[in-house]
C-alpha cells in the first residue's frame, strides 16, 4: 500500500512538472507576430482596394475599370461590362478576417473595440450593399444591389451566417444574432 501511494505521488509530481502549474496562458511571440501580420494585411487591403466614397472594395488592383476585362465570366456581356466593385465572395472575406482579429484580441479591450468598430462602420455597411430584397427569400447577392440582378449563391450566404453567428458569440450583441437568424430559418 505504501508503495502504491508513493508511486501515485511520484506520478502526480511528474505530471505537474511536465504540464506546469500556470493557469493563465501567456501570449506567444509567434501569436503576436501573426496578429501584426494579419493587421498589416487588412490595412493593406483597405489601402489598395477601397473604393473611394464607399465602404466597398475594388475587384482588382491597380483599379483600371475602363481597360479591365474579366476572363473568368461566363458570358461576353458580363466580360465586357467592368465591375466597379468586388463580388460578394472576396468582399465577404473581410468579414471573416475581421472576425478572426476580434477573436484574437478578445483579451485586449482597445484592439477588440477597434476591430468591432471596423466591422460595424466599414465591413457591415459594405456588406449591406449586396443584400437583395427584390427576391424572396431575402439573401446576399453575388454583386451589389444597385446593379442588375445577380446570382445568389447559398454557400456564400451560409458563410455569412457563420460569420454573424461567430461575432454574436464573441460579443453577445443582439444585432449580430438577428442577422445570423436570417440564414438559419
Question: Residues of each region from the PLM?
Answer:
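Bacterial Sec-dependent N-terminal signal peptides
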Residues: 1-29
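Functionally constrained cores in energy, signaling, and assembly domains
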Residues: 16-17, 94-95, 99, 151, ...
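Low-complexity, Ser/Thr/Pro/Gly-enriched N-terminal "stalk/linker" regions
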Residues: 21-147, 174-185
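Hydrophobic/aromatic-rich effector regions of fungal transcription factors
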Residues: 142-148, 159-169
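Mobile, glycine-rich extracellular loop/lid and propeptide segments
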Residues: 151-164, 179, 183
Amino acid at each position: 500500500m505504501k508503495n502504491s501511494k508513493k508511486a501515485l505521488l511520484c506520478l502526480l509530481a511528474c505530471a505537474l512538472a511536465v504540464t506546469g502549474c500556470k493557469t493563465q496562458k501567456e501570449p506567444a511571440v509567434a501569436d503576436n507576430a501573426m496578429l501584426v501580420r494579419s493587421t498589416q494585411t487588412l490595412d493593406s487591403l483597405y489601402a489598395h482596394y477601397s473604393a473611394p466614397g464607399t465602404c466597398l472594395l475594388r475587384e482588382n488592383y491597380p483599379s483600371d475599370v475602363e481597360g479591365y476585362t474579366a476572363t473568368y465570366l461566363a458570358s461576353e456581356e458580363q466580360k465586357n461590362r467592368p465591375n466597379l466593385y468586388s463580388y460578394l465572395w472576396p468582399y465577404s472575406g473581410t468579414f471573416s478576417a475581421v472576425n478572426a482579429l476580434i477573436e484574437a484580441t478578445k483579451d485586449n479591450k482597445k484592439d477588440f473595440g477597434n476591430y468591432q468598430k471596423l466591422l460595424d462602420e466599414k465591413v457591415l455597411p459594405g456588406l449591406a450593399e449586396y443584400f437583395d430584397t427584390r427576391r424572396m427569400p431575402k439573401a446576399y447577392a453575388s454583386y451589389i444591389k444597385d446593379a442588375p440582378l445577380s446570382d445568389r449563391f447559398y454557400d456564400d450566404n451560409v458563410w455569412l451566417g457563420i460569420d454573424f453567428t461567430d461575432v454574436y458569440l464573441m460579443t453577445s450583441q443582439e444585432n449580430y444574432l438577428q442577422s445570423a437568424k436570417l440564414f438559419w430559418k
